[in-house]
From Swiss-Prot:
Species of the source: Caenorhabditis briggsae
Biased composition (Low complexity): 188-203
InterPro entries in UniProt: Mediator_Med4
Entry GO CC: core mediator complex; mediator complex
Record's subcellular location: Nucleus
Protein name (record): Mediator of RNA polymerase II transcription subunit 4
TM region(s), chain numbering: none
Coiled coil: 76-100
Composition bias type Polar residues, residue spans: 204-225, 264-282
Length: 334
């Protein structure tokens, strides 16, 4: 029984079927060949062979009764195998996730250690922000590809802002609306008389009439520190800045704005739309791209003073030439 229990039900059924077949062959052989039958000669009777056949049939019936139990057991085994496979998949997925987490944690620990080392080195050797700005300025000065329209050679404010510009910028003061440098014609609050060109003087050697011009082209009203991005904190934006913000390049007339000789006194500037007094035909002030910074107004005023002195000297030389020619004509008449 123990040996039969160790074997599978299929093997037991096959073995019982083979035994029944052999016993059945022996019975048929004995009945057909009684004289030549080996079983009869050895003392075995047909009755014993039939009993053996009945015993084999009984064993087969017992095995067949065990079939439903074995079927239930097999179905349970298959169900358990399916559940085991599913659990294996879940375990494999969790294992993969754990390995990925381990790799990510190892990387983050490595990078965190590097960052901590860099932070410790930076704490041991602090660097001023002004030094970084200077170095970045040197790098951008030699490797940059674009610049603002108002930038000139030697302008230290490009392209990175200074610390005071950070403090007065829109990030710290979001309510203050500031604009870039304004190149506007100021109102004629302080007018200066200048002498016109010799061509405008009278033909009889008389003195030329005096004319007045407005304030310098650069707006002298400064409000706070200058920044190439925020300006002096002006609230209004010039037409040129509006064109630059829209992506339109101003033409040469808008930058130079040369006064035409003999123009009316109520002419308006194309930049600000404010009335502007006509200047002398010989004095043409050409200022292009000067940013609104402290110190530029004095330079413009110095240029105007030099031009005024040159015009005065030319007028005096022309008047002396006219006096000399008049004296010569009088001597000839005498």
């Amino acid at each position: 029984m123990t040996e039969s229990d160790e074997r599978s039900l299929r093997d037991l059924l096959l073995e019982s079927a083979d035994d029944l077949e052999n016993v059945l062959k022996m019975i048929i052989d004995t009945l057909i060949n009684r004289e030549k039958s080996v079983m009869l000669k050895s003392g075995e009777s047909v009755t014993n062979i039939v009993r053996l056949f009945d015993a084999k049939q009984e064993s087969v019936r017992k095995l067949l009764q065990k079939v439903p139990e074995f079927q239930e057991r097999e179905s349970l085994i298959r169900t358990l195998k399916a559940h085991v496979e599913k659990r294996d998949e879940v375990i494999q997925q969790v294992e993969n996730n754990l390995k990925a987490c381990e790799v990510a944690l190892t990387r983050s620990c490595f990078h965190a250690n590097q960052k901590v080392k860099k932070m410790n080195e930076a704490a041991l050797r602090p660097v001023n922000s002004e030094t970084l700005i200077k170095l970045s300025h040197q790098i951008s000065k030699h490797n940059s590809v674009s610049a603002p329209l108002t930038w000139q050679i030697g302008d230290p404010s490009r392209p990175f802002p200074q610390e005071h510009e950070f403090r007065t910028g829109q990030l710290l003061n979001p309510k203050i609306q500031s604009s870039g440098p304004q190149i506007l014609l100021g109102k004629s609050s302080a007018q200066k008389p200048i002498i016109a060109s010799p061509s405008a003087s009278s033909s009889n050697g008389g003195t030329a009439p005096t004319r007045t011009v407005g304030t310098p082209l650069v707006n002298s009203a400064t409000n706070g520190d200058y920044s190439p991005r925020t300006g002096y904190g002006a609230e209004e934006t010039s037409p040129i800045q509006e064109q630059v913000l829209l992506g339109v390049t101003p033409n040469e007339k808008q930058w130079q704005n040369p006064p035409m000789p003999g123009a009316a006194t109520s002419s308006q500037s194309p930049l600000s739309g404010a009335p502007q007094s006509p200047s002398s035909p010989s004095v043409k002030l050409k200022i292009s791209g000067i940013p609104n910074r402290p110190g530029d107004i004095d330079q413009v005023q110095e240029v105007r003073d030099v031009e005024q002195m040159s015009s005065d000297s030319s007028n005096s030389s022309d008047s002396s030439d006219d006096e000399g020619s008049s004296k010569k004509t009088r001597g000839r008449n005498k």
